[in-house]
Structure formats: C-alpha cells, structure tokens
Amino acid sequence: VGSMQRFGVPMGFGGPHAAFFACSERYKRLIPGRIVGQTVSKNGEKSLRLALQTREQHIRREKATSNICTAQSLLAIISSFYAIYHGSFGLTQIAKRIVNLRINLESCLSELGFDISDGSRFDSIDVYSEYSEKIHDEALKNGFNLRILPLGSTPEDSTGFGLSLDELSDEKEIHKIITFIANVIGKKEDLKPICLDKEDFFIKNIPLRNDPWMQQDIFKNYQSETDLMRYIFRLAEKDFSLVDGMIPLGSCTMKLNSAAELSPVSWANLSSIHPFAPSNQTKGYVQIIS
C-alpha cells in the first residue's frame, strides 16, 4: 500500500490523496471496486474490459466490498496523468535529483559538525543537536517548519529536527536552510557554496531497482504538453458528464462533484499546508473541518 501524493497532488493538510496497492493472487477477490484488465477483441485489437467486479450487483451481497470504496477519482486521475506525462525516465530523474539534493544537504550539515546517522533513506534527514530549540526558532523566522523530534514534542523540549525534500526543493532553498543553521551554531564562516553535479548523480545508501518498469505504451506516448492535452480531451469526449446531460439518480459511479468542490485541490494558498504544520498556521483549515 502506498500514497500517490508525490505524483502531482499537493499536501492538502494531509489529504485526500489517492492510494495504490497490490496483493497476492489469493486475496484478489477481496479488492474493493472493479479491476480493469487488458485483452484482445474478436477483431484482434487491444481492448480493455472489466476483469474482476466485487460489487453487490455482481456477486453475493455478503461478499461485496464496494461499500468501502471512496470517491478519490480526481486524485487518482491527477496522479495517473503525472505518471503518464513523466514516464519512467522522467520519474527516475526527479527521484535522482531529490536524492542528490538530500546528499548535498547531509554533506553540508556534516561539515558544520552535525552527526548524520547511517542508513537507507530517500528524501528525509533526522538530526539530533543541543541547538535544536534555537534552530526551530530560527527556521520559523526564515519561513520553514522543521519536523520536531522526537515526534509529539514541542520546539522547547525537542532534541532534534528533521528535513524532507521534494521535487519543488532546489539549491537556493538548501543554501538558505544551511545559512540560518550555521548562524545559530556560530559557524557561518564554514559555509561552502552548494553546486549539484547535473550529469552524474551520486546515489548512495539506496538500493536501486534495475528491472524495467512502467513499460506500457501509455507511459511513452504522451510526453509533450500537446499530446497529453489531446489525449485527455479524447478521454473526456467518451465520458458522460453534466456537459452532456443530467446524471441519473442512483448511479453510484456518477455522483455529482461540483467544480467548486474540486478546484480547491489546485489552489496554492489552500492546498500546500503540511499536516504537521503548527496549529497557529492552520486556523483556516480547522474552521473548514469543523
């Protein structure tokens, strides 16, 4: 089981996000909803069909699992098109860049005297320091929320801080973080310029998969903005929506989600709040939820 949040969906104060999951053959009939499979039509053409259905309409009611499905289609569509647009090569480059940023951040922190623990990790660093409280205070002044360690503690009684990077992080952001940390511990003169090697990514402590993945045609054919836009429009033309007519009552796969409900997903001033953000930064979200 995993979250698709990193595939083009903002944090949104912790959700909602689409998920992906896999299971062994023995559990496949317990999967909720419908599974679409690829087959060949009688004319020899590639086609898609419903391969497995677990709804009350199709199997005995006591074995149905559709009652635990949720309406996450918009989030799943966003993540799917993010993967389609970037393909396996693009996603690999994004991941390698994040790892490279993380390695540079670790290197800078080590040069400032911080002890960075060994271990396999992707985008996050945990650092324990006697300067933890002061670093948290300085981070807030510079517009950053650092993860408070141990989890559940306050900046005042914390013993460490954590940093996580993503595809929006860059060298300028890392330099800003390192600068205010160096100021706190009195080592500003030890700062060195951050310069990423764009050609040869130094990946360490992460076991990389070498087998091919996302090799289906769908992840290779729509990697320009124009191609993707035309593909989305062709799919939309096949759909039945309010553009075509009223959605019939009782159709559980076609419930109305109004545009006003869906569009805030892309609002930068609403959708980018981290679920661990301090309560004094999330008053608007608390009001919406309550």
Please provide the spans of the model-predicted regions.
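Buried hydrophobic positions in well-ordered alpha/beta secondary-structure cores of metabolic enzymes
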Residues: 19, 98, 125, 163, ...
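Short amphipathic alpha-helices in soluble, non-transmembrane regions
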Residues: 135-142, 176-182
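Short Gly/Ser/Thr- and Asp/Glu-enriched loop/turn motifs at secondary-structure junctions
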Residues: 117-124, 148-161
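Conserved N-terminal alpha-helix of the aminotransferase class I/II PLP-enzyme fold
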Residues: 224, 269-290
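Active-site C-terminal subdomain of aminotransferase-like
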Residues: 4-119
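Flexible inter-domain linker/hinge segments
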Residues: 171-248, 252-260, 265-268
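Noncatalytic alpha-helical scaffolds and linker/capping helices
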Residues: 152-162, 166-180
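Conserved PLP-binding catalytic core of the aspartate aminotransferase-like
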Residues: 112-140, 165-168
